[in-house]
């Protein structure tokens, strides 16, 4: 599995990831990231990541209040731990791909988890947020990026 195009550049739309074992949520494929009417949010998370737990509620609220499309990449995580974590905190993800080896993380240039991407309908990364989307400044910055990307209407308050 490669996430790079023929030119060697990151191509998020080229990534196909199997579902996390034990979850009913389907895996993540190219078709899930391209051709959508609005940009898709891709959140890279892990059950062992303390900041991921902190941002989970914020992302869940954005999905529930704003109707955003959120998909996840479970990074270097044991499937049973991810399943337990999502059962405890809730699962706001429409799809979750498993990156058990960390290969996608390398190809996407992750510096750590969590990281959250806004992906346009053509598979282009429109915005990348490194770290947890928590706190007033982070949430405001991320919401402005969602507006600029066309995922939220200006004045839409979550």
Predicted regions and their residues:
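Thiol/disulfide oxidoreductase modules built on the thioredoxin-like
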Residues: 87-92, 99-158
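Extracytoplasmic/secreted envelope proteins and their assembly/folding machinery
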Residues: 56-60, 79-86, 136-139, 143
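Short pre-active-site segment immediately N-terminal to redox-active cysteine/selenocysteine motifs
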Residues: 37-40, 45-48, 112
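Conserved redox-active cysteine motifs that mediate thiol-disulfide chemistry
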Residues: 44-61
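Conserved segment of the thioredoxin-like fold in thiol-based oxidoreductases
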Residues: 54, 69-100, 113
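A short beta-strand-turn-helix
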Residues: 3-4, 8-40
């Amino acid at each position: 599995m490669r996430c790079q195009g023929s030119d060697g550049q990151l191509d998020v739309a080229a990534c196909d990831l199997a579902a996390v074992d034990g979850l009913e949520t389907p895996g993540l494929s190219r078709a899930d990231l391209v051709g959508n009417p609005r940009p898709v949010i891709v959140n890279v998370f892990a059950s062992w990541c303390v900041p991921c737990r902190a941002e989970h509620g914020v992302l869940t609220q954005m999905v529930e209040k704003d109707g955003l499309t959120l998909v996840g990449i479970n990074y270097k995580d044991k499937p049973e731990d991810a399943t337990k974590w999502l059962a405890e905190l809730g699962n706001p993800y429409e799809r979750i791909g498993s990156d058990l080896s960390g290969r996608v993380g390398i190809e996407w240039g992750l510096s750590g988890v969590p990281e959250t991407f806004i992906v346009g309908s053509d598979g282009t990364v429109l915005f990348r947020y490194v770290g947890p989307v928590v706190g007033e400044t982070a949430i405001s910055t991320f919401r402005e990026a969602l507006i600029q990307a066309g995922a939220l209407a200006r004045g839409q308050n979550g």
